[in-house]
Design a protein with these regions (language model features):
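Glycine-rich, often proline-containing surface loops adjacent to acidic residues and nearby aromatics
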Residues: 41-50, 74-79
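Short, amphipathic alpha-helical interaction segments positioned at domain boundaries
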Residues: 22-47
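Short, Lys/Arg-rich nucleic-acid/phosphate-binding segment
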Residues: 10-16
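Short amphipathic beta-strand starts and helix->beta connectors
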Residues: 3, 29-36, 63-67
Length: 223
């Protein structure tokens, strides 16, 4: 609720929680980032958004910035945002991001010149996205859940409540990292990137926990 993801409604002594309007929008943006891995080839093209922040309400502009970040954009100046163009190129980024950018923003594509040194590009990546911190968070995730994955492989028939709890906390931890990971294509990532291994651990553990945890949820809902 504090972060604006949920809204609550009192019904007697109970409180009913559901996605807020902004929370539902953020969840739609997050879905492909959480459940898909970035393995696209990149040909040097970028999406660029230039925001007219001087004509926007500050609170609304802050929300636009957060939504752009959750869509993989990095901030290279106060009102200019970029991300590698690796999705369906038949879809205009303005149409894809209709809910995320200000109506007064300008969206276009650009291309990295191949005749210049790659050093400025490497420096730009480092200044735009904090990949070292994200990599460290992935490594913490792997250290925490890889042993669990090995244990569940040996004994996949966990009690339903235990399987549900592990699945819930694991996906919560993984989602928090994916929301700040720009999902850059491999060509722009540092060596020994830990995101792929973290995705593998999360994907495998999730699949192993599905049968027991889903059965537990169905039994709980049926009373």
């Amino acid at each position: 609720i504090t972060d604006g993801w949920l809204s609550s409604e009192a019904q007697g002594r109970r409180s009913i929680y559901r996605y807020s309007e902004s929370g539902a929008k953020r969840d739609r943006l997050a879905q492909p980032r959480v459940y898909q891995n970035a393995n696209d080839l990149w040909d040097g093209e970028w999406h660029v958004v230039v925001a007219n922040n001087w004509s926007s309400d500050p609170e609304l502009y802050a929300q636009y910035v957060r939504d752009l970040m959750w869509s993989g954009f990095g901030k290279i100046s106060e009102n200019v945002f970029i991300r590698p163009r690796v999705s369906d190129k038949s879809v205009c980024c303005c149409r894809e991001l209709a809910e995320s950018i200000s109506p007064t923003s300008i969206c276009f594509t650009a291309e990295t010149a191949r005749c210049v040194s790659q050093e400025p590009l490497v420096d730009l990546i480092k200044r735009t996205w904090d990949l070292d911190t994200i990599k460290s968070r992935y490594e913490v995730f792997i250290d925490r859940y890889e042993p669990l994955l090995a244990a569940v492989w040996k004994n996949p028939r966990l009690p339903g409540a235990q399987a549900f709890a592990i699945r819930l906390f694991m996906m919560h931890d993984f989602r928090r990292i994916r929301l700040v990971d720009p999902m850059l294509p491999p060509a722009l990532l540092p060596d020994s990137w830990s995101g792929d291994q973290a995705f593998y651990v999360a994907h495998e553990l999730y699949d192993l926990l599905i049968p027991s945890s889903e059965q537990y949820v169905m039994e709980y809902m049926q009373g």
